[in-house]
Every structure is written in structure tokens, then in C-alpha cells.
Amino acid sequence: MKQIAWDEVMKRLEVASKICNDASPVQVEGPIHVGVDLGTADVVVMAVDDNGMPVSAFLEWATVVRDGVVVDYHGAITIVKRLVSMTEERLGRKITEASTSYPPGTDARLSTNILDAANLRLVSTADEPSCLARLARLDRAAVVDIGGGTTGTAVISNGKVIASVDDAES
């Protein structure tokens, strides 16, 4: 996978910020890829096109997760279903699958079970800092993900995550 320039990563983040919670319908040609982030402070459902450019992003502030653990299972499912429905409305297509992430050192099933309960087929899962490393196609770097309740760190060498830890493990 070819590394992308940092300005391209920033452009993608700026687009995501600009379209966040924008329900205006858009036409997207080709496949889309959906990700679900169950955070301590919020829940996000984002869709990107086949080039990795955000085409839909919905965020809802929530307290369904605490320190990387889902503490309100029903609430998390309800929010994910609502945000997926909003994504479907914006894109004019049914969402049946998604990827998700989790804080390093926690059980991935805490996130994947929510997707399953929301009737989404799991495409992939990885710890949160590793997801950013993949998105940015980093070759050699350290990624720090400072969240609302956890801080994850990943070290990347030759494009592979060689270490990934959470502040709770340190």
C-alpha cells in the first residue's frame, strides 16, 4: 500500500469535519466503506468512498462507553442504528456491513458485538491507533490516539504495527 502525503490525510479530516452531521443527500459512485467508532465521549458512523475520501459522517455525543468498555449496551445499539439510518438516508443506499475499532488492551468483542446487534456484518476490526496508521498509510511512525477516556499508542515500522498499548496497560 503506497504511503499518502500528510496533506492528503489532513484534507480527508477536513472533509469529515465539514460534512459531520450533514444529512443532505449525496450521490456516491462505486463502493463505500463504513466505520463505527464507539468512543467514551461520542459515537461516530463514517462512510468513505473507494479512495478513502469521507462522504458521510454522523456523530452523537453519548456516554454509552466508559474507559473502553460498553456500559450501556442497549443505548449503544440504539445510537449505532440511528446513525447508520442517517447514513443510509444521506447516501441513498442500504448499509449492511461496517468496520470498527477498539482501545488497545480491551476486548474487541465489546465493539463487534454492538455491530452484530445493530445487524451489521463485521468487515474488519483493529485497535484505534492502528486504524489511523492504516488510514494514513504510515511507514515509520508513532501514533497517539487521545480519546475521552483512553489514550492508545501504536508504533509502526515498515508499514506494520509492531507495538500497540493503552494508557490503562502502562
Feature map (PLM): residue ranges:
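Nucleotide/phosphate-binding catalytic cleft detector across ATP-hydrolyzing
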Residues: 1-40, 44-146, 158-169
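Conserved structured catalytic cores and adjacent interaction surfaces
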Residues: 154
